[in-house]
């Protein structure tokens, strides 16, 4: 621990001088462009306290840097790729096998409306994750679904787009309730082309 004694008159004068100064005495001689990646929510899953903490801290840093005159670009950086998507797709097929996404002979356009709600998604992922730990066949099928999605398989890409739309709408609402907003809504999937 650090023990420090401050003269109350000195502190009062210092704070009053700060209050009177432009931007509270903070100077930024050469503004910079700063990218801040915070939030880090996973799609199809509810936010937890760790996401809330990083969102509030990141939002505070963003606002301070903007106040200092820097250009700040904020990115939520979503967890929207990988095995979790394969798990969701595989569990969705178990629950709703008659959806056109699982009919290999289907050649039409995929529906614009998602075949699930955010509440269903938030229940599907933990169920699928638990199932993959005890059911090797299910786990392997999820790995194959992940590979197909990442290879551009149209039916799974359509499901993934639904997952993204439903999840991002919900995340924007929840982050908005915290007065947290992002300039970019990029995710792990944005690195896929590289």
Locations of regions flagged by a protein language model:
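NTP-dependent nucleotidyl-transfer catalytic core
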Residues: 1-194
């Amino acid at each position: 621990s650090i023990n420090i004694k401050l003269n109350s008159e000195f502190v009062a004068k210092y704070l009053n001088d700060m209050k009177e100064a432009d931007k509270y005495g903070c100077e930024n001689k050469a503004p910079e462009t700063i990218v801040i990646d915070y939030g880090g929510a996973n799609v199809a899953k509810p936010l937890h306290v760790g996401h809330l903490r990083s969102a509030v801290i990141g939002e505070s840093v963003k606002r301070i840097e903007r106040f200092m005159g820097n250009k700040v670009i904020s990115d939520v950086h979503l967890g929207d790729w990988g095995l979790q998507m394969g798990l969701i797709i595989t569990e969705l097929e178990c629950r709703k096998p008659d959806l056109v996404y699982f009919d290999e002979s289907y050649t039409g356009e995929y529906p614009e409306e998602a075949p699930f709600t955010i509440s269903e998604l938030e229940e599907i992922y933990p169920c699928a994750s638990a199932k993959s730990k005890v059911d090797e066949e299910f786990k392997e099928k999820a790995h194959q679904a992940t590979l197909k999605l990442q290879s551009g398989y149209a039916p799974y890409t359509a499901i993934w787009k639904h997952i993204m739309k439903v999840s991002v709408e919900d995340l924007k609402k929840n982050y908005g309730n915290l007065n947290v907003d992002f300039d970019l809504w990029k995710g792990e999937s944005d690195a896929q082309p590289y």
